[in-house]
Amino acid sequence: AYDAVFRHYGVLRVDDMDQMAACLIMFSQATLPKHGNLVCLHDSGGERQLLIDLDNDLSVPLTEISADTETKLSSLLDPGLPAVNPLDAWGAGGTNAPEVMASCFETLLLDQSAAMGAVVHDRGPSSEIYASYIPYLERGKNLSKKPVFLVSNRQGSGESRLAVELTHKGLPVIDGINQFLTGTKKMFEYRDFQKLYKNRSKLKSIKSLSIGKSFDKKIDERDTYD
């Protein structure tokens, strides 16, 4: 019974407090996802595969990038790195690596099938967030106007003032890939429910209008035999 009521009213459900906290942080930023799915930027092939494995259980839709996006990414990536989503864009490193990472994230977000994006990078000692991550987020959000998030596998012991500052600026920092994927799924569910609700309201309006017109119609004696 609860499931039916929750589906009808668009109630979002989570399994624990960590997932709830992640959802609250993600929903608190001003931009909600529109059409499309999730794109992710990584600096580790192993971590990229970890996200894919975890996503198999949660079934969060990942963006299938277009041929045009694939071509643009290939021109940015070091040899041997596949132009796919989720994307491991960290090759040999070097002084140009931050620019490559930022450009790759922009390219992913500008794909027509991308609704939101995540930079999945780990924190440093004492939960430090490296300042070099910030341009990836800022450039991606400013160019695409889509929600973006900085995601780490775990917070660790300690806290980062920068994490709070970025979150308040609309660039939320989320700890835990599972928590982030759950939050992403809930954002997509909320988006889809809003579309369904609008369609349902529109249908009710049409029905009300039709019923109203039928009552406004003058009935003469001949109509009573129809």
Where are these regions (language model features)?
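Short, small-residue-enriched loops and turns at beta-alpha junctions
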Residues: 124-128, 155-157
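Proline-centered loop/turn at the N-terminus of a beta-strand
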Residues: 12, 145-149, 172
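A charged, well-structured terminal subsegment
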Residues: 6-32, 173-206
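Glycine-rich, charge-decorated loop segments at or immediately adjacent to ligand/cofactor-binding or catalytic sites
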Residues: 152-169
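N-terminal beta-alpha lobe that positions the nucleotide/phosphoryl donor
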Residues: 198-226
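N-terminal alpha/beta PP-like core and its mobile active-site loop of ThDP/TPP-dependent enzymes
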Residues: 1-8, 161
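Short glycine-cluster motifs
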Residues: 34-114, 119-123
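Charged helix-capping and loop-helix junction motifs
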Residues: 130-137
